């Protein structure tokens, strides 16, 4: 929300459970499920790095919200989509596929270091903070240059 993508990703990685289980030593320290969001990561003495209070659905929904809305920048409101990505500089190109009702959206992002431009189905050009009216059926291709 502060438009600091590298800091946002750093914080996201700190709370993402999979980041705490990449090597055996980290798994032994973390001690909780790598597929469940923890409410706490302890920082004191012999408990430093250990997860706690897992299986809280509120925590997982906030992580999902951070991923979708604030990092990938996808926000659906009243059947309209806005796209405002806040991704690290090293993410030069990436793709997202999502379904809305019976439609499938294929979104291709590309960082070019200029004003944001969105192209929908190769003909409709949307600039800055305009939204896209979502279709309920079919396939839709969106290209995001930012």
Where are the predicted features?
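Non-catalytic C-terminal accessory modules of carbohydrate-active enzymes
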Residues: 1-146
């Amino acid at each position: 929300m502060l438009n600091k993508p590298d800091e946002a990703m750093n914080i996201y990685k700190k709370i993402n459970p999979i980041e705490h289980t990449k090597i055996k030593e980290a798994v032994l320290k973390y001690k909780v499920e790598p597929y469940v969001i923890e409410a706490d990561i302890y920082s004191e003495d012999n408990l430093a790095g250990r997860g706690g209070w897992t299986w809280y659905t509120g925590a997982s929904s906030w992580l999902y919200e951070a991923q979708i809305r604030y990092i990938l920048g996808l926000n659906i409101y009243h059947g309209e989509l806005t796209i405002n990505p806040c991704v690290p500089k090293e993410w030069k190109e990436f793709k997202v596929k999502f379904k809305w009702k019976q439609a499938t959206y294929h979104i291709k992002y590309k960082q070019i270091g200029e004003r944001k431009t969105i192209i929908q189905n190769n003909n409709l050009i949307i600039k800055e903070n305009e939204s896209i009216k979502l279709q309920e059926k079919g396939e839709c291709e969106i290209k995001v240059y930012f």
